[in-house]
Amino acid sequence: MLSDVEVGAFLSGGVDSGYLASASGADQAFTVGFDEGDRYSEVNKAAKVAEKTGLKHHVKIISKQEFWDALPDVMYHMDEPLGDASAVALYFLSKEAAGHVKVVLSGEGADELFGGYNIYREPEALKKVAWIPFVLRRAVRKLAAKLPDVKGRDFLIRAGMKVEERFIGNAYIYCEKEKAQILKNKVTGPSTQEYLSQFYEELESENRGSLQDMEKMQSVDLNYWLPGDILQKADKMSMAHSLEVRVPFLDKEIFNFAAKLPKEAKIAAGTTKYIFRKAVSEFLPQETNERKKLGFPIPIRVWLRQNDWYQMVTDLFTSKEAEEFFHTEKLLQLLNDHKDKKADNSRKIWTVLTFLIWYDRFFTTCSK
């Protein structure tokens, strides 16, 4: 890669960033982690990649108080509420990198192009029941929906749905019924499913019904999740620190190459990104190349069950701003059920939490 300045790379313990850091000619690598055990920190795994490739490795460990304190600034630079906690990690990662380089490489796009998300394996799993007539699967789905949350329930429900119904992208957090329960004002716009139905129809028409379910899922993510979340937060969090982020996997030639690959080249042998992993294996430690997709592990699930965060979120959920938009007793129920480990409501809580912080930053604080 040609550049007039020293180039760094964002480095997690995964295959995408590991390959970029190893093969691109980057000079330095940057990783963030959390002091919540290996499950929520990829620092040690990233260090092995950096050691193998001889990269100078910079690490930032983010405390939960730092994370909380940064939220107003993160929401300010995002310009809009974003229910994706990894934006905060990217904020700190960009800040760390900006102290050393002007340009960094990042692995955005590889999962969408080469089939890296675990949910893309679902169509293959559902083939086990494909021999059952759809009308029967639909009937079983209705019965399963009435069951308590037991193992296998979700599979039965999703087996009775077409991909156009069951997959609306990685950003799915609240169903329409849940939205109606927590919001004081009725949502007048189309539901997420209704919004995407036109896209699915156009996709079907353009490809004359030739796309497999996984390819439809990739198309949704490439057209909505990637530009609406992944690239937005990378761009805005890096620009908050005057850092330029480049995303080589989204080069036009790579995009066109990946688009021609059959499904079997992406999901095979029980793994995601099959052909990609094969192609880059020589650049990475074996354990890195064989790792399952983890995403950006953020310990908000843990922190929301700890007393300090629980109290801070309770204060927000009972504020006058929360009262304006939400049935606060429903918010507190989500929070309490999560703290008591009755459910994992972390993403639902986080989505409301970031909206309230964004609203306070732009409308309450600014008006003062």
Q: Could you tell me what each predicted segment is?
A:
Residues M1-V5:
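A long, amphipathic alpha-helix that forms part
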Residues E6-T53, H58-V59:
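ATP-dependent adenylation/pyrophosphate-handling site
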Residues V15-D16, D35-G37, Q65-E66, A110-E112, ...:
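Short, solvent-exposed loop/turn segments at secondary-structure junctions
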Residues S24-A26, V43-K45, V74-M75, N118-E122, ...:
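Short, glycine/charged-enriched secondary-structure capping and boundary segments
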Residues V43-H77, T192-E201:
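A conserved beta-strand->alpha-helix junction
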Residues L55, S86, G99, V103-L105, ...:
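Adenosyl-5′-phosphate
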Residues H58, D79-G83, A125-W131, E264-I267:
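Short, polar/flexible loop-turn hinges at active-site or ligand-entry regions and domain interfaces
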Residues F92-K151, W225, I230, A234-I254:
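Active-site adenylate/phosphate-handling loop in enzymes that bind or generate adenylated species
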